[in-house]
Amino acid sequence: MTKHRVVVGLSGGVDSAVTAHLLKQQGHEVVGIFMKNWEDDDDSEYCSSNVDFVDAAAVADVVGIEIEHVNFASEYKDRVFAEFLREYQAGRTPNPDVLCNAEIKFKAFLDHAMRLGAEKIATGHYARVRQNPDTQLFELLKGLDPAKDQSYFLHRLNQAQLSRSMFPVGELKKTEVRRIAEEIGLPNAKKKDSTGICFIGERPFRDFLNRYISKEPGNILDDRNRKLGKHVGLSFYTLGQRSGLGIGGVKEKGAPRGGGDHDPWFVARKELDTNTLRVVQGHDHPWLLSQSLLADQVSWVAGHAPAEGKAYGSKTRYRQPDSPALISGATPEGFRLDFPEPQWAVTPGQSAVLYDGDVCLGGGIIAAVDPH
């Protein structure tokens, strides 16, 4: 194995900690960097950055590597958070983790690491990279642990980024990562996994959004134009949402799915022109099912779109099982996906990602659903 100078992104979590340990064991020259990507809440109960850095520094001490604290908050605010707010204000539901990976962890962080003389960077993502022996192209693969695979969030990475990236824990199950952490005495071996969007932390999402987006209340209507209540603003809801609607509809035990009087309500549409939130009853209501989508902001791992006329695996949300999809009309600006089986709550602003088996091909941002 070729030995490299590798800069590891140490987050304070167990995955990046084991990543650093594995690389050190393999004989690489390893340096740790803690990325501070958000500082608006430094004095808030919701900010874990200071605690995370203490954990990361303790990990570096156990592993036996140096660690540097680097502030990327300005880049994050300009490249990720500003786009996050624009998307919500436009009525879509963005995934900032996808943009953070492309713009911060594998661009700003990568550039910083290269300036330090690194040949590679490594993170604790559950994914894999390999170079195809026939095409010599770098491929992004799913992590071996299907319950933890994070290739969906990495689908915008290009050849230059992948060629310099390493994901050691992508070859392991999460249980193995925890076991290694305990065996070598890592102080964060039992630290719980982080959840949610990094700059929101554990606070209620609506409370956070209130600080940046003004409320524009409007009507909540069902599929028969019956008024059921008022919403606080379309930006605060996402397709498929069930809780927080304030209109009741608790499902009775044994009630049928698909529109019974006692079925729960789900957000089905956001009509921006009339500021109307449309809701329907039943998980399998036709308004929640989609046969096709259009995507823009395209990024293909290989640098070009996959061949048409073949069914690929697809995901329109994280942790969704792969669903067959046919791609057509692919241009540098966008593509269309058609689904043999209807997909539930396909949401504009989220990513549509294609797979050929375990190989992540890339994808785009969902712009329209069931276009005519």
Curated annotation (Swiss-Prot):
Residues 95-97 are annotated as: Interaction with target base in tRNA. It holds the Pfam family tRNA_Me_trans_C. It is found in: Cytoplasm. One of its GO terms (cellular component) is cytoplasm. Disulfide bonds join C100-C198. Belongs to the MnmA/TRMU family. Catalyzes the 2-thiolation of uridine at the wobble position (U34) of tRNA, leading to the formation of s(2)U34. This is tRNA-specific 2-thiouridylase MnmA.
